[in-house]
């Protein structure tokens, strides 16, 4: 859900970053440590802007959580993907099983099998309220033990941010008075009124064996 918000920012006319994503899992330098991680890719002169935007959206989620409509969409998407995996369970390639066993051995990831996972999660997921998700977020995203890594090309004229400049960005966002995210989803139909059906007034042969139809309504 947070990644969906970041994707919205990426699609704005003047996006604050080229790409951004968050995840919770292994710390990228160590598989023995779990960490909530935010990643932003920026232009060479947009490091501060990207870091600010990423930090701001993470902080917004920490303060206000997710909306019921966001959660409903995310839950529906998850259950739809789970159902698709269940329906395609007889078409799984061998490498998918190999990768699953590797993750089980290295990361201790459970491997109940899609039949059990489908049955279990269809009982559990619908009964987890958004309030439970939001109450968990502060324990996942907090102010302790924060690590910031900046990866930049080594080139002449490149301005590398200092530790103090990075701290200033984080502190500035922390001091902002944020507002809750507004989920601007419309339930209005794409077309308010269905156009009247036209008729085919002309048929021509097109390129590559295609047929070009001219309709009465344009």
Regions found by a protein language model. Name each.
Residues 1-2, 218:
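Active/ligand-binding-proximal structured segments within catalytic/core domains
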Residues 7, 72-76, 80-83, 103-218:
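Proteolytic maturation boundary segments
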Residues 2-130, 145-153:
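M16 family metallopeptidases and their MPP-like homologs
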